[in-house]
Amino acid sequence: MRYDVLARAGFARRGNLHLPHSIVETPVFMPVGTQGTMKGIVPEQLVSMDCRILLCNTYHLGHRPGHERVKAAGGLHKMMNWNRSILTDSGGFQMVSLSKLMTVDENGVNFESPHTGEMMALPPEKSIEIQQALGADIMMQLDHVIHVLTTGDIVKEAMHRSIRWLDRCKVAHTRDDQAMFPILQGGLNLELRKECAKEMAKRAKVGIAIGGLSGGEEKDHFWRVVAACCAALPPHLPRYVMGVGFPVDLVICSFLGADMFDCVYPTRTARFGTAMVRRGGLMQLNQKRYKEDFLPIDKKCECNTCKNYTRAYIHSIVGKETVGCHLVSVHNIKHQLDLMRDVRQAIQSNSVEQFLKQFLYDYYGPIQSENPSKQDSEKMREVPQWVRDAVDHMGYKLDF
């Protein structure tokens, strides 16, 4: 398992992450298959989109069907018929966000089982045991997760505890065919983030994750933390910003120097009939304006949905038939994968500034319609100040 940097452009890198089941081209977006399956998409469809890696949730798989059963089935790859790479999270985030009764002490995380109601303990060693049974290519350490807006001594305490838990995870990690990423914590405090990055870098072998973001913080804080962490981390390891999935966030973070991302957003937003498009950002297909719009979601998209179905058809079934969610999910995942492909090409060709200008101009422009008179507005929306500041930090200029 190794990471090769193939090209650089400003802060950004384009690389190949060599894993047991596939070579993953970075920057990369990882779709989320919560319990070993994507919402409304089968593995064969992901292969047809050239998806090389996806994320599965240790917390959910540990409860259903259970890691012992997954191991007995031959591991997660075999059970879900997926012969490409998998990354599993540690389960810590879900315990904090989903459990009504949750406490953390030096031993680990104590939480209420969603199935039995009994209190359970998850020490770092148990998290690694479960992930090794699942058999993912990349595992995550158990970290002390706190809300991103938390302030005070607990932020520093959680950061130092995450470092100590990493050391325990390293002792429990016995499989050479599985990589393990540390998770960088420190809240919105840039000095704590830099301190944590220094300690995690001493221990990391394959890659490092930037955790504790995308939880409701202001975007101006978000991008500055990502930029500071990327600058502080070793240049030879991939940097994984956890929980990032909005297209603008993916683009900005990639050009700040991040390499890996994951989020449920593409499939979650599809359930509400929302399609992701380059021009206009989001297309609300449940709106009446699409009732007689016989264009595909995106003329330039090569996904099966855009090749075969119209906006009008999807409008007629979204929210009524499960196939509506399926069709939009297929498009949204392909949209994200294609976006990251274009980001990689921009880095490879050293055309980041040109790409940024075109992407942002399109994204904040009006959605193309079969009948322009039906568009809500022909005016371009304002590019957020945080985006402009991040682009300026990269050394590029927007002329609109």
Swiss-Prot record:
<feature type="active site" description="Proton acceptor">
    <location>
        <position position="89"/>
    </location>
</feature>
<comment type="similarity">
    <text>Belongs to the queuine tRNA-ribosyltransferase family.</text>
</comment>
<keyword id="KW-0963">Cytoplasm</keyword>
<dbReference type="Pfam" id="PF01702">
    <property type="entry name" value="TGT"/>
</dbReference>
<feature type="region of interest" description="RNA binding; important for wobble base 34 recognition">
    <location>
        <begin position="267"/>
        <end position="271"/>
    </location>
</feature>
<keyword id="KW-0479">Metal-binding</keyword>
<feature type="binding site">
    <location>
        <position position="143"/>
    </location>
    <ligand>
        <name>substrate</name>
    </ligand>
</feature>
<keyword id="KW-0328">Glycosyltransferase</keyword>
<feature type="binding site">
    <location>
        <position position="303"/>
    </location>
    <ligand>
        <name>Zn(2+)</name>
    </ligand>
</feature>
<keyword id="KW-0819">tRNA processing</keyword>
<dbReference type="InterPro" id="IPR004803">
    <property type="entry name" value="TGT"/>
</dbReference>
<dbReference type="InterPro" id="IPR002616">
    <property type="entry name" value="tRNA_ribo_trans-like"/>
</dbReference>
<feature type="binding site">
    <location>
        <position position="185"/>
    </location>
    <ligand>
        <name>substrate</name>
    </ligand>
</feature>
<dbReference type="InterPro" id="IPR036511">
    <property type="entry name" value="TGT-like_sf"/>
</dbReference>
<keyword id="KW-0862">Zinc</keyword>
<feature type="binding site">
    <location>
        <position position="301"/>
    </location>
    <ligand>
        <name>Zn(2+)</name>
    </ligand>
</feature>
<comment type="subunit">
    <text>Heterodimer of a catalytic subunit and an accessory subunit.</text>
</comment>
<feature type="region of interest" description="RNA binding">
    <location>
        <begin position="243"/>
        <end position="249"/>
    </location>
</feature>
<comment type="function">
    <text>Catalytic subunit of the queuine tRNA-ribosyltransferase (TGT) that catalyzes the base-exchange of a guanine (G) residue with queuine (Q) at position 34 (anticodon wobble position) in tRNAs with GU(N) anticodons (tRNA-Asp, -Asn, -His and -Tyr), resulting in the hypermodified nucleoside queuosine (7-(((4,5-cis-dihydroxy-2-cyclopenten-1-yl)amino)methyl)-7-deazaguanosine). Catalysis occurs through a double-displacement mechanism. The nucleophile active site attacks the C1' of nucleotide 34 to detach the guanine base from the RNA, forming a covalent enzyme-RNA intermediate.</text>
</comment>
<protein>
    <recommendedName>
        <fullName>Queuine tRNA-ribosyltransferase catalytic subunit</fullName>
        <ecNumber>2.4.2.64</ecNumber>
    </recommendedName>
</protein>
<feature type="binding site">
    <location>
        <position position="331"/>
    </location>
    <ligand>
        <name>Zn(2+)</name>
    </ligand>
</feature>
<dbReference type="GO" id="GO:0101030">
    <property type="term" value="P:tRNA-guanine transglycosylation"/>
</dbReference>
<dbReference type="GO" id="GO:0046872">
    <property type="term" value="F:metal ion binding"/>
</dbReference>
<dbReference type="GO" id="GO:0008479">
    <property type="term" value="F:tRNA-guanosine(34) queuine transglycosylase activity"/>
</dbReference>
<dbReference type="GO" id="GO:0005737">
    <property type="term" value="C:cytoplasm"/>
</dbReference>
<keyword id="KW-0808">Transferase</keyword>
<feature type="binding site">
    <location>
        <begin position="89"/>
        <end position="93"/>
    </location>
    <ligand>
        <name>substrate</name>
    </ligand>
</feature>
<feature type="binding site">
    <location>
        <position position="212"/>
    </location>
    <ligand>
        <name>substrate</name>
    </ligand>
</feature>
<feature type="binding site">
    <location>
        <position position="306"/>
    </location>
    <ligand>
        <name>Zn(2+)</name>
    </ligand>
</feature>
<feature type="active site" description="Nucleophile">
    <location>
        <position position="262"/>
    </location>
</feature>
